[in-house]
Amino acid sequence: MPLRSGGLDAYGATHIGKVRSVNEDQFLIASLMKLVEIEQTSLQDSDLGQLTGPGRAALLMVADGVGGLQAGEKASETALENVARYVTQTMRCYYTVDEAAEERFIEELRTAVMRTHEDVQQAGEAHPGQEGMATTLTLVNVVNRRAYVVQVGDSRCYLFRDGELSQITRDQTVAQDLVDQGVMSAVTAEHSPFSHILSSAIGGTASPEVYTLDLHTDDMLLLSTDGLTKHVSNVELREQLGSPDSAEAICNRLLQMALDDGGSDNVTVVVARVLEPPVED
């Protein structure tokens, strides 16, 4: 069911696609209101239950696993479950919009991601056939209409505001590194085999990047794995996110567009609309 708390109307969906035999993507949407209530997730038989943690907030995450057999699936599953636990603990460190508190909160988010990175590495080493498993991770923690975005890998976060679409995250791929160094053009990078090679990944070599932004009423957030952006252009994303429809309707349309264009990879989409703040008594 959609999330309609924490100041958001949010919905997520995932699909194996039309080519792959295993879905290695995962997503998670949670409200944090003195406890974490998992509203919707693709995780199977999750034992997360209710995790204590004060504060009113929302947590959105997507992950795209990498590895042979079912290792990628396990990596993305482990990452989301463990990050959810660590972020719950992190929320205790941040209650108000205070610069010093915010810096501590951001550092705690980085720590949560790096602890998860170590967990995935250890899980891979402990189970034959899962050595070297890794995953992307993109999360958005919304607290009091401020968004904290943490990214490892190339799963993206977009902001749609007043008709404009902005990519908040930077793809952590070899191709993007070459673009940043002036060695390759952005157009060439889109079709380069290096665009599929991660320069940072949970379980591999993780270098989490953190972005912060203030949110406005009717802003739209989009998190997705590359199974969406391989098939749906920025023009199409802008058109869909500009719709007044619910997050659920927009999410399902985007996923179907990727499938209709070929569905060459697993596809995972999370869409969230920022709601009008409640009237204070």
Task: Please report, for each region that a protein language model flagged, where it lies by residue.
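PP2C/PPM-type serine/threonine phosphatase catalytic domain
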Residues: 1-281
